[in-house]
Amino acid sequence: MAEDSAGLPSNYQFWMQKLSVWTQASTLETQRDICLHLPQFQEFLRRMYETLKEMDSNAIIERFPTICQLLAKSCWSPFILAYDESPKILIWCLCCLIKKDPQNSRESKLNSWTRRLLSHIVSTSRFDIKEVGLFNQVLGYAPTDYYPGLLKNMVLSLVSELRENHLNGFSSQRRCPERVRSLSRDRVPLLTLPDFEPLVEALLTYHGHEPQEVLCPEFFDAVNEASLLKKISLPTSAILCLWLRHLPSLENTMLHLLEKLISSERNSLRRIKCFMKDSLRPEAAACHPAIFRVVDEIFRSALLETDGAPEVLAGLQVFTRCFVEALEKENKQLKFALKTYFPYASPALVMVLLQHPKDIPQGLWHQSLKHISEMLKEIVEDHGSYGGPFESWFLFVHFGGWADITAEQLLMSEAEAEPPEALLWLLAFSCSPGAGHQQRARTMVEVKTVLGCLTKLFRSPALSARDLQAAAGENLGGDPRPPACQQLVRRLLLHFLLWAPGGHTIAREVITLMAQTDAIMNEIIGFLDYTLYRWDHLCVEAHRSRKLARELLTELREQALPGQVNQ
């Protein structure tokens, strides 16, 4: 096409052919060819605009029917839209096609087609907000036509820059720390918008070369709150970065969890497990020992401050179970040695406790319990190098199922058999780690006496509540038992009611006699809830015992006063 007849550059046909090739093939050679010719093509567009702006839209279409094809192919090329001022020049060219007062359907259709292309360019290109506003004012279409695409493109552009990617063959410059900090602060009001999630993730995983944190604290706080309230969904890798870079976020998450443990989710381990997996991310703790140790230390402090509150203890055990599952799933080959998770504990004891009871033949449980007891006793009573009694107890109760298995094993042993000292010591230690040697010995005597009576009654066909009252009666001259010992005896009685054939018929009567206070009522409900949870994980096949435990749990929850126990 001649330049004098068309009013367009003489190489118009050359670029039409190039665009056809570029749009039909997406090979590496094609992309290189595009990048090679982008400067010349932009100059062609500029000269073409200088020609088109002097013409009426009808005249342009009448004389040059392929102009729409050329502009459309240019507008849908991400390489052209990403290069320098090409998007602006394309907009100028398209504006030449718009008829301000269309007189017929053909002109109206051309206007609609042109506006769609303009909206596409505005929403996919990087423009200053003032330029976007100017386009809107001149072209006369609503922001809703292009804002969603513009927002998405802006987010993708920022993500690309943060990750120092190469866009269409052009390297984006690294952002300075002040710019990254400003970016994190300015996006706080917007971070719950779904389109902003990739940017939030990119900011959290951004790693510059600065010695100090570049993201603002307000950003971390807002992300953590939004994550807790389910207003934003982030992958575990981003949550891991959040907690490693901002300790208060992890602490706030833990405080939120503990509040639920003690209030709304009390005695509901299944809901606690779901909540814990959603918010605390045990897999994040498995991925990095630092996170596990912070969570562990918060649980430790909570147990000390609440004097070993059962709900906190149960939460620790659920967290540990989830953590171990994540550890086994994510780290078939451990990235970190176990000692980095439990730096002050005996490695041998940790290895034994990490074994899930269901992975050990039931006939060997007694042997495993004896081994655990001997190792703990050596550390506690021989003053080993792994901390005091509380530290050993704290490690043991992470894997609290072993203590309940100990009680069950002792109850179901032969009536004539002498209860093993190792298992008695383990029970006494589990209920009162701070007790001295003499106090622990007394507890062992108390438990041994109660067990002797219960094992004799275990297979009795006819039982009464009075029989169990007598079996659990105070001993040693009538001195009152310490509270921890009383709680241990109650747990033995509850185990008996669930496992003894004759216990099922008197269970409700015995529990009514036991639950003299709201605290004991909550204790019994917590025991039943945890027992069912533990049996599920052990795959215990005890239909009658399970049925009784579920019925008792439902009935006691209904009896509990509103606000005392989660419904």
UniProtKB/Swiss-Prot annotation:
It is found in: Nucleus; Cytoplasm. GO terms for biological process: cellular response to oxidative stress; interstrand cross-link repair; nucleotide-excision repair. GO terms for cellular component: cytoplasm; Fanconi anaemia nuclear complex. InterPro entries: FANCC. It comes from the Eukaryota. Keywords: Cytoplasm, DNA damage, DNA repair, Nucleus. Coiled coil: none annotated. Belongs to the multisubunit FA complex composed of FANCA, FANCB, FANCC, FANCE, FANCF, FANCG, FANCL/PHF9 and FANCM. This complex may also include HSP70. Interacts with ZBTB32. Upon IFNG induction, interacts with STAT1. Interacts with CDK1. Interacts with EIF2AK2. DNA repair protein that may operate in a postreplication repair or a cell cycle checkpoint function. May be implicated in interstrand DNA cross-link repair and in the maintenance of normal chromosome stability. Upon IFNG induction, may facilitate STAT1 activation by recruiting STAT1 to IFNGR1. This is Fanconi anemia group C protein homolog. It comes from Bos taurus (Bovine).
